[in-house]
Amino acid sequence: MWTALVLAAIVAGGAVAYGGWAYLAVGHGAPLWPFIVGIPLAYLAIPLLLTIFWFVLAWWFRAERPADIHLALPARIAMFGREFRALARSAPRMILYRWLMPDPKPAPASLPILLLHGVGCNAGVWSGFRRHLEACGIGPVYALSYGPPLASIEHFAEQVAEKIGDIEAATGAPQVIIVGHSMGGLVARAYLRQFGGAKVRRLITIGTPHHGSMHAWLMAGMSLAQMRPANAWLATLNGNADGADGVPAVSIWSWHDSMVTPQTSSRIDWGENIVLTGIAHNALLDDPIVWAKVVEQIGRAATSGSPA
């Protein structure tokens, strides 16, 4: 709710300011058509500038990459375009998250999926991802919007525990599969550390900064502070040899992540790593390759039985 309200206020404020400017300009003889054409351009300018900014930072703090994953210029342009598209889609998705991501109707189920979003987002960012899972016959698929946005990761983990309880009550399923994007993976791990892994069949993280991200230094908030490299909270979380507290885990990450820096921060040594190239941070949620990898992992979890 918090993120949707903030975004809606920003969009509404921008629309009022833009409309007022257009009204005054047209009143003084300016043509109307440039302002009409400028409506989508004004909106798209924001994700464009953010995409450029994140890519510059990602290059500056980049991890040393193997020579064989170098991207040619056309591939780099395509990657930039996909990330820009993902960011441009995110605001309307998050504003409309209650309509796009309602909980499934209560019904018996064997292995529900729970999606956990990253910092500053809400369940709306998963809308395309969930549609694909459901099209593959996977479900029921739930998503949690936790908040307030900049609270501690432990606070979010408590909300995950409540959500898992709600899912169990609605489906009768004793376990869920958790899929976490970005900070969502850390929220899942914090849940496992606080509440144990008895109710989680498998943990799938996507673009999660398991060892922190330099980008987190640019923003304020408790959850951001917990994602800064080498901070005490992360050191404690990573202090156990098993970072998922006995739950089978996989980290899906990209050498070209635009917000996890260095990109190798997503690498884990207590689970499986699925390493991709040519996909930036937000575009991971809309990428067919990532979808296929997650579907495969869910299938493996469904046939593996409950962990001991």
Where are these regions (language model features)?
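Serine-dependent carboxylesterase/thioesterase catalytic core
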Residues: L114-G124, G128-D245, I252, M259-V260
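Catalytic histidine-centered segment of alpha/beta-hydrolase-like enzymes
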Residues: S152-I153, I279-P288
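Short, proline-enriched alpha-helix->beta-strand connector loops that line the catalytic pocket
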Residues: A109-L111, A244-A249, I268-E272
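Generic C-terminal helix-cap and adjacent flexible tail
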Residues: G299-A308
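Post-His helix in hydrolase/transferase enzymes
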Residues: L285-G299
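Acidic beta-to-alpha connecting loop that harbors the catalytic carboxylate
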Residues: W255-H256, G278-A280
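Flexible, membrane-associating and regulatory peripheral segments of lipid-active enzymes
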Residues: M1-I113
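Conserved loop-alpha-helix segment in the C-terminal half of the alpha/beta-hydrolase fold
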Residues: W255-E272
